[in-house]
Each structure stands twice: as structure tokens, then as C-alpha cells.
Curated annotation (Swiss-Prot):
Species assigned in the record: Sulfurimonas denitrificans (strain ATCC 33889 / DSM 1251)
Residue ranges crossing the lipid bilayer per the database entry: none
Names of the cofactor(s): [4Fe-4S] cluster
Name of the gene encoding the protein in the UniProt record: leuC
A single MF term (Gene Ontology): metal ion binding
Protein's name according to its UniProt entry: 3-isopropylmalate dehydratase large subunit
Keywords from the UniProt entry: 4Fe-4S, Amino-acid biosynthesis, Branched-chain amino acid biosynthesis, Iron, Iron-sulfur, Leucine biosynthesis, Lyase, Metal-binding
Pfam families in the record: Aconitase (PF00330)
Example of a GO biological process term: L-leucine biosynthetic process
Length: 419
């Protein structure tokens, strides 16, 4: 019987053919925790009486939400993870010395691999599906169960085939494609399903575009997002010291899908998600007509904090100045991205334009620190959520966009079409 890529990944892990709707127990290749969620997992682990990790090399802790610590509480949270990592000689522990946002850092380190089953106590764990893996977010107690047993229970998800056709125009990115998908199907349109991205557009999308798309699959309610392994994936992994051998799968031509969604990417404008849902998408053309003035532009997060994002921002900002009424904050996804951006001159361009470049952190995205919005302030942001109060005050507003839109809007002072 024909299978989707997701069904094949689970089948290989279980040792028999499994299909959508089945409840299975499955070993996990990589379990991911961060400074916010891991302390809860550690408590559950210790309360269970467990004294060892089932798969130490398959467990990563990345301190990224409030690192360097923003206050005493976050410092104490981080210490719990540090002490645990030291106690168990955890190889894959990342703090200030080798820091980054978890969903940017782990692919960089070769710790997530095609064909993997990956879970993380963070909803945007679905990012890693861009490498041809099944990757999903779970709760902290689910994480603890995997720490103890090496596996977990899953219902094999049904799949929605997203058939993307055409070559994207300049400044239309993976971020715009996923915002358009969410606009079409809504924030619960893919509930407990896999969004499988296919079609002629895929060959034109960089690995960074694919990370952005899979990252925001959860914003449509999806269990995961996935892009099959191809030459772009191969090129990205070529210089990585991979934790495991890739296991490459492709959906059968006659695999069963609950829905097929066709999108003409060639005619797609950059998309702006208006407050207060990622599904509230509008063309950047309409947004410019609406003359939406901004107080802050933010470029970063696990969605759009990669080198290509800093590159396009620098290209637009070169020789320009940020509008006097606007703050521009740029947060690279990892130290390596920061280092490369500095080497290529992007950091100087951003700073010369009046922007501020921070250390890698999730901070501003979740309204934690390093870019919180005040009462009634408006931001254009490359992050993934724009709920009420997401980046600060409950009276603030966040418009989601790609990095080119954020950069040109920072210069103009209102949401602007970069084309």
C-alpha cells in the first residue's frame, strides 16, 4: 500500500508498515529542550526516580529564550539545565559559549538529520522538517518520558499535500508562501496533520526558505511540516558532521492525502499578516496603501534569523538610515550566523544605518526582552506569531512579514513594498 513520506519515516522507526491514524510507540532520534521548558522536564525526570538518560547523545539542551539571563528568575532557570547537563555529562548542551536559537543551531550542528523522528518542548520544533525529518513539538512531561525511555507515543498524522508551482518573484520568500497557506486554510486548517510541501517551486527555494515554511506549519495547527530531501538539502548538509546517517524517504506517487492545496507562487506578492492572527494575511501592496506607521522593525527569530535574512536586510539598508521614529532590532539566529554576517560586512551596514544587532536569542519574539513593545506601539516583525500581547503590551500590534519588507519599512517608517 502506498505511503506518504511521514508514514515511511515512522514505518522505518517502528519496523513495520504503519499508516495515518495508527497509534504507535516510536524511538526518537533527537529530543530537544530549552531554558524555559527543560526545567519542568528535569523535575519530572527526577520525580520518576530515573537515574540515567535512555539516549544521552540524542538529547540536546539549548539555552536560548532568556540568554544571557535577563533577570534572577531566568538565571535560576538556566542554572537548573546547566547543573543537569553537568551531572549527566551531556554532550549536546549549548549556552552562551556556543549559543543560538535552538531551531537554527541544531541544523547547523548536524544534530538533526533526514529521516529522523524529532521532538522538542517548543512548538516550533516542526522547523526541522525542512531537512526531510518528522519533527514536532510536545509538552515538557512528554519530553521527560522520552528522556527516560528513549521513545514516545504518536498518532501517525494524515498529510496535506501543498503543491507549489512557479518561480517566486524577487522578495517573495518561504515566509510569504507559508503566510499565504495559513491565510487560505486558517490557524486550524491542518490540525494534527503534516503539511507536505511539494511541486516545481521547491527547487527554487533555499534551505532557509524551507526552514521558514516548516517553522510556521504549527501556525496552521499542523503536527509537522516537511520537505523531501533533494540537492538543496544535500548541499546544506555537505559540510556538517552529521550525528547519524541520513535515511532518505519520498512519498509514493499514489500516496493518500486528506487534502491537496495548489498555490501559484509565481503570482504571489509578499504577504503581511495583520494583527492578531498569522492567518490575517494581506498583500504588501494593500499594506502599503493602508499607510501603516511603525515604531519598531524586528528581524530575527527561529523563522527569519538566518544569514540570508541579514543579507537581504543589509542590501536594502546599505547607504540608508533607519527612519527617526523607528527602532530597528536585528537578532542573528546563532553565533555562527553573527560571525559570518560580520565577516561579510552586514553587521556594519546595519549598525551604520541606525540598527542595533543583538546576541542570538528568542527574546523579543515572545515578548521576553531585547525588543518588547510598549502601549499602542506597532511593529513589523519577521517572527511567527502576532497574537494579542505577543511581543509586549496587550495594546501593541505586530504585523508579520519577511526580512526585506521589515528592512525597507524601517527606512520608510511605514509598511512598504520592497520591490
Amino acid at each position: 500500500m502506498a505511503q506518504t513520506i511521514t508514514e515511511k519515516i515512522f514505518s522505518q522507526h517502528v519496523g513495520r508498515a504503519v499508516f495515518a491514524g495508527e497509534i504507535i510507540r516510536c524511538n526518537i532520534d533527537m529530543v530537544i529542550g530549552n531554558d524555559i521548558t527543560t526545567p519542568i522536564s528535569i523535575k519530572a525526570f527526577e520525580d520518576s526516580g530515573a537515574t540515567k538518560l535512555a539516549n544521552p547523545d540524542g538529547f540536546s539542551i539549548v539555552l536560548d529564550h532568556f540568554i544571557p539571563a535577563k533577570d534572577i528568575a531566568s538565571a535560576n532557570q538556566a542554572r537548573i539545565s546547566r547543573d543537569f547537563a553537568k551531572k549527566y555529562s551531556l554532550k549536546n548542551f549549548f549556552d552562551e559559549k556556543d549559543m543560538g536559537i535552538e531551531h537554527a543551531l541544531l541544523p547547523e550542528k548536524g544534530l538533526v538529520v533526514p529521516g529522523d523522528v524529532i521532538i522538542g518542548a517548543d512548538s516550533h520544533t516542526c522547523t526541522h522538517g525542512a531537512l526531510g525529518a518528522f519533527s514536532t513539538g510536545m509538552g515538557s512531561t512528554d519530553l521527560a518520558f522520552a528522556m527516560i525511555t528513549g521513545g514516545n507515543w504518536f498518532k501517525v498524522p494524515e498529510s496535506i499535500k501543498v503543491n507549489l508551482s512557479g518561480k517566486p518573484s524577487k522578495y517573495t520568500t518561504g515566509k510569504d508562501i507559508i503566510l499565504e497557506i495559513i491565510r487560505l486554510i486558517g490557524v486550524d486548517g491542518a490540525l494534527y496533520k503534516t503539511l507536505e510541501f511539494t511541486g516545481s517551486t521547491i527547487e527554487h527555494l533555499s534551505i532557509d526558505d524551507r526552514f521558514s515554511m516548516c517553522n510556521m506549519a504549527i501556525e496552521a495547527g499542523a503536527k509537522s511540516g516537511i520537505v523531501a530531501y533533494d540537492e538543496t538539502t544535500k548541499a546544506f548538509l555537505a559540510d556538517k558532521n552529521l550525528a547519524r546517517e541520513p535515511r532518505i524517504h519520498y512519498s509514493d506517487a499514489d500516496a493518500s492525502y486528506v487534502q491537496i492545496l495548489n498555490i501559484d507562487v509565481a503570482s504571489l506578492d509578499p504577504v503581511i499578516a495583520y494583527p492578531f492572527l498569522p492567518s490575517n494575511g494581506h498583500s504588501v501592496v494593500q499594506a502599503q496603501k493602508d499607510n501603516i506607521k511603525i515604531d519598531q522593525a524586528f528581524i530575527g527569530s527561529c523563522t527569519n534569523g538566518r544569514l540570508s535574512d541579514l543579507k537581504v536586510a543589509a542590501e536594502i539598508l546599505k547607504g540608508k538610515r533607519v527612519h527617526p521614529d523607528v527602532r530597528l532590532i536585528v537578532t542573528p539566529g546563532t553565533q555562527m550566523i553573527l560571525r559570518e554576517a560580520n565577516k561579510l560586512g552586514y553587521i556594519d551596514i546595519i549598525v551604520d544605518a541606525g540598527g542595533v544587532v543583538s546576541n542570538p536569542t528568542c527574546g523579543a519574539c515572545l515578548g521576553g526582552y531585547m525588543g518588547i513593545l510598549g502601549d499602542n506601539e506597532v511593529a513589523i516583525s519577521t517572527t511567527n506569531r502576532n497574537f494579542v500581547g505577543r511581543m509586549g503590551s496587550r495594546s501593541s500590534k505586530v504585523y508579520l512579514a519577511n526580512s526585506a519588507v521589515a528592512a525597507i519599512s524601517a527606512i520608510k517608517g511605514y509598511i512598504t513594498d520592497p520591490r
